[in-house]
Amino acid sequence: LCDRRQRQMCIRDRLLIMDFGVKKMYIGGRLCESVAGTQKEIISPATGECIAKLCVASKEDTELALQEAQKGFEYWSKLSLSERNEWIAKLRNAVIAHKDELHYAVMYEMGKTWESADEDIDMIVDALEYYPNEMLRMRSQVLPDLQGSHTNILVHEPRGVVCAMLAWNFPILNVAYKVAPAIAAGCSIIIRPSIDSPVSAYLFGEICAEINFPAGVINVLTGSSKDTSIPMSESLIPRVLTMIGSSATGKKLVAQSATSIKKLGLELGGNAPALIFDDCDMDKAVNTMVGLKFNNSGQVCVTPNRIFVQSSIYDEFMSRFTEKTKAIKVGFGKDKGINMGPVINVKARERIMELIDDAVSKGAKKSLGGIPEGMPERTSYLNPTILENVTPDMRCFNEEMFGPVATIIKFNTEEDLDPMVNVPDAGLASYVFTNSLERVQKYSKFIECGEVQVNGVKYGINLPHGGMKDSGLGHDCSHLALSLIHISEPT
């Protein structure tokens, strides 16, 4: 990391050369290269250039991290709450001191806009403050004794080593979701960021090393599934496995973890419905849908994947929605006036375009879209796209798009709408826009999702976030995240 006095100069140089150097793993309190010496070039989807050389973990590195995390847990769990909170406050201050480096790392590895990168960085700062305070608010319980001969106390103890396998779309926000509650509760953790966006997570490991955070409590590495996530899942050391990613990958993790009984926390794929009724606040509905749909280039698990619009307001909604979508400026987030960056890589863009082509071949009407002209080679930009006349037989209706494509379905009445809202394999987020309290009450119960947002959107570290069906188990954020890593133990 840069000395604080040199930080601004270092950031300026990095912006010019777009090179974050060799990023080492963080295992057992020290920065280290892979036992096998393997490195991987990390290509920015925004520039097409190599921005870092990443030390990639071997199976031996993963085994070492597991052993070090166990040692870290044995030390960390024995510290007092105040001692742990002092260390976490020191870590939070160090993150704030290096906020600019983290910010640019997220921008370059994802191509995010400045505002979108803010979501990542602000979340880790907030989480490292929220969870130590949440631990101070936690209370043990005295349970009644039927015979009157004992005093029964229910206390909360840390489970042990946590292994966290993370998605690429919010590289530091996802770290925040997992690290903050784990270390606040007295657990140690191994962070396995996605190989597609690992730079900022490795930089977080450097920050931990800089302040000499207790060895083994936080560990950061990534690599192939066979060398990292599978050994972690199959190991007998972890007591908690937690993941953010696709439903298909989550199912594999569940199967791999069966070598022992582990606590699982899974935040998986979504297929969020948004219901726009004829009595809605049109400004609020349009602005929220455009903001949600194209934020982070549509690569958000809670983004509205199916937007249902009542026929009596359809034309007005589409006119205003299209006008706002046309105004989105696509490019690299560091450039002035940019509203949306690229998708994560060319492979992801090809999949999105396959879903678009499938919909058009089955009768959908496509407007806008296409690959922007004049972008550098090896970049993965895609213009915002709108699909109308979408029907349930199209892949985009049933699969998570995870890209800047709005799929619109017109409906006449609630009787027409209701059979299309719920799907058998997903239930993460949903949105309802109406001024009818009766409708709000109906759909908050009818929609089979972990979250129902009404007339707007609100997410935060203090609000529980989780799904049902194949969209996951348990919750990130809020005090409920602690239930994953705590054992409630009667004494």
Regions found by a protein language model. Give the residues of each.
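Rossmann-like NAD(P) dinucleotide-binding subdomain of oxidoreductase/dehydrogenase enzymes
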Residues: 140-284, 411
